[in-house]
Amino acid sequence: MSFFPAQPSDKKAIEEGAAFMPRFDASGLITAVVTDARDGELLMVAHMNEEALRLTLETGIAHYWSRSRGKLWKKGETSGNLQSVVELRTDCDQDALWLKVRVAGDGPTCHTGRRSCFYRQVVAENGDISLAIEGACDHEH
């Protein structure tokens, strides 16, 4: 039995209605974009299964589904950098989420010790494609 209501066949109800009916993909996951609630910086992109989303809503602490480890993941549980959810939004067809969070502890979100997982810029110049690394890694991982 699902914690969330089934999506109706009426597209308008999904796109304009007030009922939260997240649409999980064939693997049972929904994409979650995570930004810092203070300044809007993009911190990470992750995935949630139904249990992770339910726990996030119940506790106010972000939980995700680790595809690589195949298990539930309470972000920051080991490092102390827990993500407190300030606001949660869904997109027009309810198949993606946007979490605005406050990060506890000393602040890094990425397992590399950086604040954001998006620290590399893809640079295309003169037919060459490379990565430009922004910001040093301040923490051991």
Swiss-Prot record:
Cofactors: Mg(2+); Zn(2+)
EC number(s) from the headed UniProt entry: 3.5.4.19
Pfam families, alphabetized: PRA-CH
One annotated Gene Ontology cellular component of this protein: cytoplasm
Positions of Mg(2+) binding: 91, 93, 95
Any GO molecular function: zinc ion binding
Gene3D superfamilies reported for this sequence: 4.10.80.70, Phosphoribosyl-AMP cyclohydrolase (3.10.20.810)
Pathway: Amino-acid biosynthesis; L-histidine biosynthesis; L-histidine from 5-phospho-alpha-D-ribose 1-diphosphate: step 3/9
UniProt-annotated location(s): Cytoplasm
Transmembrane segments: none
Reactions it catalyzes: 1-(5-phospho-beta-D-ribosyl)-5'-AMP + H2O = 1-(5-phospho-beta-D-ribosyl)-5-[(5-phospho-beta-D-ribosylamino)methylideneamino]imidazole-4-carboxamide
Family indicated by similarity: Belongs to the PRA-CH family.
Subunit comment: Homodimer.
Listed name of the protein: Phosphoribosyl-AMP cyclohydrolase
Gene of this entry: hisI
